[in-house]
């Protein structure tokens, strides 16, 4: 599993980036400094969310873990007071379920996004024996989701209009019949919004 110290560090860095971005639109954030973290923001809780996802098993498209994580994310987001919608689409014959969390019907000025699916094959693993096994997805998948969920719990309700988007079917390029970033491409092509800023959170749990 990914390095816990790295998770806590990167959570703080990413939160700083988020508040700086939102500060372009909301004067209340102009006093933010890199040393300050909102009360209740927990790196330990985010790390636990990573473990929860890994315990579901691979979240490859169409798998039991893939369905389970969607329901779990919905529960966590709704518990934090967000409205949850599913953007359904299809690319290359594969169903897509992008999860959108928002606080109201106002179009977003900012989108914070991560992908939640995992890769069918660990073809970049240093151990060739694992190249045909699915990726556990602690770093590549779960870390970004954990950050967004913790932001969902701690972002102020009166912040700049923001959507949290959890992209599906992003991670299986170089697999026959698949391609990279299918979910985010479908979202961009089909959801008629024009945010001023987009922050993608991905693979933030490496030790380095």
Q: Which residues fall in each region the model found?
A:
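Active-site histidine-acidic residue metal-binding/catalytic motifs
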Residues: 114-146
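Hydrophobic alpha-helical membrane-insertion segments, chiefly the h-region
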Residues: 12, 16-28
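N-terminal capping segment at the start of a domain
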Residues: 25-70, 206
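N-terminal Sec-pathway targeting helices
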Residues: 2-16
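Second-shell loop/turn segments in exported
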Residues: 34-40, 54-65, 86-90, 131-142, ...
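A non-catalytic alpha/beta surface segment that caps or lines the substrate-entry region
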Residues: 52-106
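Solvent-exposed loop/turn segments at secondary-structure junctions
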Residues: 60-61, 90-92, 105-107, 116-120, ...
């Amino acid at each position: 599993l990914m390095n816990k110290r790295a998770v806590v560090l990167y959570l703080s860095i990413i939160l700083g980036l988020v508040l700086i971005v939102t500060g372009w639109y909301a004067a209340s954030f102009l006093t933010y400094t890199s040393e300050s973290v909102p009360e209740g923001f927990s790196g330990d809780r985010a790390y636990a969310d990573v473990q929860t996802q890994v315990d579901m098993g691979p979240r490859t498209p169409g798998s039991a873990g893939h369905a389970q994580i969607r329901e779990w994310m919905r529960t966590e987001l709704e518990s934090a007071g967000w409205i949850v919608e599913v953007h359904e689409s299809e690319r290359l014959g594969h169903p897509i379920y992008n999860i959108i969390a928002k606080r109201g019907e106002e179009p977003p000025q900012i989108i914070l996004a991560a992908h939640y699916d995992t890769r069918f094959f660990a073809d970049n693993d240093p151990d060739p024996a694992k190249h045909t096994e699915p990726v556990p997805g602690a770093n590549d998948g779960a870390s970004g989701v954990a950050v967004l969920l913790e932001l969902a719990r701690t972002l102020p309700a009166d912040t700049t209009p923001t959507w949290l988007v959890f992209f599906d079917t992003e991670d299986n390029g170089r697999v026959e019949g698949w391609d990279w970033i299918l979910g985010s491409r479908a979202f961009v092509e089909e959801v008629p919004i024009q945010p001023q800023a987009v922050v993608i959170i991905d693979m933030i749990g490496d030790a380095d």
